[in-house]
Amino acid sequence: KELYGRELTRSECRNAEEALLILAEKRPGLTSANGKRICNRCGNQDRKKMLAAPCACGTTCFYCLSCLNMGKIKSCTVLHHLPEINAFERPIEPILQWQGQLSSEQQRASEEIVETVQAEETRLIWAVAGAGKTEMIFEGIAACLRKGGRVCLASPRVDVCLELAPRIKQAFPAVPMALLYGGNEDGYSYTPLVIATTHQLLRFREAFDLLIIDEIDSFPYH
């Protein structure tokens, strides 16, 4: 299950079964289009962030500087991907166990968020700090999970992810959840609910039915 909804190099597929690696979709780490090299992990097309160097494969390979801190993506790198199949057990009701109370305006926003989730559309939630944005998304998350969907809450900042994790876990105690950020020693687990830094999203591909990005105006996401 390590590969479902993800795109990884061979060295990152430590726990994947060999049979699944054979079945996985494969594409090169770097490709060329219209005279430009493109990193298929981070999307970088800046020539200044592509360098060439002798490689262990026996040739000179270009590699991407833009996502180098997540491991080197080279011309000879092969990325492995299996489509997301949402192989999760349906959570037992009540999925959402938050006991708080929304104000009338918060409730209206929450209902509109649920409508957006059900219609599979995009919505911007814009409010001052402390307005209860996190609590307003709870019903939207629950609506997606009830349909067997996969949900990710992402932020450019590790501290925000660490602050969100216990609040989300308390609201959805019966739903398996993974927390992903650089340096986290817990590693990856295949779960219906994910909290991750935006950098970690580069290892996913078409994985989530609902993606919520917090602090969207923060560096480095914006």
Task: Put a short name on every predicted segment.
Residues 1-34:
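N-terminal alpha-helical interaction blocks
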